[in-house]
Amino acid sequence: MMKVLVVVALLVTLISYSSSEGIDDLEADELLSLMANEQTRKECIPKHHECTSNKHGCCRGNFFKYKCRCTTVVTQDGEQTERCFCGTPPHHKAAELVVGFGKKIFG
C-alpha cells in the first residue's frame, strides 16, 4: 500500500511540474503572438492610403478590415498603370450604416 502512495505522489508531482512548464510555454507563445500582432498593427496601411505594393496590408476599420481596391490609371504618356488604395467596400459601408442606425435607435 505504501508503494502505491509513493508512486501516486510521484505521478502527481511529475504532472504538476510538466503542466506548469506547459503553461509557461503557452504564456511565452501568447506574448510573442501579441507582439507580432502589435507589430502588424503598426505596419498596416490606413484608409485612403496606397496599397499597390501590399494588397493584403490594409488596417481594420470600425467593424471590418479595409480592402485594397485597384483602378487603372492612364498617364499623359498613354501608359496604363494600376493604382490601389485601402477603402471600405460598398457592402461593408451598408452594414456599418445599418449598425450605426441601430445603435442610435436602440441605445
Swiss-Prot record:
Transmembrane segments: none annotated. Residues 21-41 form a propeptide. It is found in: Secreted. GO terms for molecular function: toxin activity. Keywords: Disulfide bond, Knottin, Secreted, Signal, Toxin. Expressed by the venom gland. Pfam families: Toxin_35 (PF10530). GO terms for cellular component: extracellular region. Disulfide bonds join 44-59, 51-68, 58-86, 70-84. The keyword Isomerase does not apply. The presence of a 'disulfide through disulfide knot' structurally defines this protein as a knottin. This is U1-lycotoxin-Ls1a.
